[in-house]
Amino acid sequence: MIKTLLVDDEPLALDMMKSLLREHSDVAIAGAHTSASKALRAIQDLGPDLLFLDIQMPGMSGFDLISKIQAERMPHVVFATAYDSFAVDAFDVHAVDYLLKPIDPSRLAQSLQRVRDQRSAKANTAFDHRDNDRKSHMMTALDGLHGVQPKFLDPKPGN
């Protein structure tokens, strides 16, 4: 499941996004917030996998919110906004995608597939690192055995 958090200052936009995301069985909506500051606390508490984020919000913009998230807690981010002028900035902060409102269901499906692909690649990379760590430990252990002469038990009793 993709644990998802929605952030938009417009309740109607949140409702629309919830409705669209319900069509995707692997997406679990963990929360929806109209305030970026409340969303920041939810990100810290819930650790979502995915964040759908509006850009222009009162008090704190979507970009401001992103800048306050610790790197190790950074979810995948898809910006959902009515303004196309922020697209380059969105990709500068490594957003997975940038959706224009009103959100087209097929574009949303493409965004979710990108998220799935990135999650899969990240999981494979983590597995590769764990596998490499195990190999390294085994090689260190084998190196420690290099030059050790095996001792055999003498089958004759008393020796």
Q: Where are these predicted regions, by residue range?
A:
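Conserved sequence signature across two-component system core domains
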Residues: V7-D8, H33, L51
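A structure-centric signal for secondary-structure junctions around beta-strands
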Residues: M1, M74, V148-Q149
